[in-house]
Amino acid sequence: MNTFNEKDWKLFREKLPQWQESHMEKLCREYLEILGKDTQPSDRFWELDKRINSDKHHLELRGRMSRSNMDINIIGFIRENVITLDDLLEFSDELQNHMRLIVERTSMVFDG
């Protein structure tokens, strides 16, 4: 478990609403892509229903915003391309280095 400083925690809580809205915007664009497919309306409906339910589940898991889960939430936003490591430049060097290390380790696992 990581304990980041109070400044990082306050900055995270400040940026969180913007990041969440960016994530919702990304999801809405993806939903529009599903609706715009050249398939049967019922197929689009059920595909969208399945996708929304899956996204709701992930959002509920991420809804556990606490200082002890801050790194997990940040990595989730990075993994889903809501933010990048550059969005963390205002955070402490410790947090930035920690996130960079996690991204490097997990990209090795997922990429190869």
Predicted feature locations:
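Acidic, Ser/Pro/Thr-rich low-complexity regulatory regions
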Residues: 1-112
